Amino acid sequence: MRLVEIGRFGAPYALKGGLRFRGEPVVLHLERVYVEGHGWRAIEDLYRVGEELVVHLAGVTDRTLAEALVGLRVYAEVADLPPLEEGRYYYFALIGLPVYVEGRQVGEVVDILDAGAQDVLIIRGVGERLRDRAERLVPLQAPYVRVEEGGIHVDPIPGLFD
């Protein structure tokens, strides 16, 4: 079993145990989630309130119980995730991929930062010098960044990987 983080619980919603969910919309397709420190919980209800998702979990029946879960990480089992359409990827699948600029490996994806308007790849460089091994931030934006078989290809960005 392999778990991947899909989000965190935000503030409670109303009085009957609802929690705002901050994270991947993939939660809409799940029947259960793994809650940090609390184990597996069935999703009993899930709905939108404006732009937010609200989740009701089995055993979380009032606001006091919901408050105990605020800020906790929420995970899903990889096998429970729905398949994605061609050209789309789960972010966890990008972690560890090599990054190439003009056919030369310049680093490896170590994390992905949710920066609001667009997500950002955190790439740890490869090389002999300390500067070569520094982390660099690259917006995850097509057509400048392409996920292809064998790695991620980034168009040259002057000064970033020189």
Swiss-Prot record:
GO terms for biological process: ribosomal small subunit biogenesis; rRNA processing. Gene3D superfamilies: PRC-barrel domain, RimM. It holds the Pfam family PRC. Signal peptide: none annotated. GO terms for molecular function: ribosome binding. It is found in: Cytoplasm. Coiled coil: none annotated. Binds ribosomal protein uS19. This is Ribosome maturation factor RimM. It comes from Thermus thermophilus (strain ATCC BAA-163 / DSM 7039 / HB27).
